[in-house]
Amino acid sequence: MDDANVPSLSGLPLLGAADRADPLFRRTAALAWSDRNPYFFAGAAARGIGGPHIGLDMIWPMSIVTHAMNSDDDAVIRQCLTWLKTTHGGTGFMHESFHKDDPTKFTRPWFAWANTLFGELVLDIVRRKSKLM
């Protein structure tokens, strides 16, 4: 099981604890982003990891951010950006979590931790994949 928070197994490269290209990390991330993780959810709005604190079917945007930051695949990064742009529930901010099928059902209308991590993602993409911005 992996949780959406950072630090998490999915966020190890962000902490410098693993290289995102390391085969062991890649397998760990693939497991976390699969149905084998009881807190991985896929719905009409997005796919991502949640956690036991909020309940089932609630995706944390932080998990989508870390997924994008751990990827070198332009299509994966674009998909993550699309999910992040379309799941703010009309507020323009990242939330703690949102429902996998209905992003207007969310927790915390403004969540500084997720907003800050999203800012880190923007800087990361500008440095690594500026053509995607």
Residue locations for each model-derived region?
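Extended ligand-binding clefts on enzyme/binding-domain cores
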Residues: 1-63, 70-72
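CBM-like carbohydrate-recognition segments
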Residues: 51-133
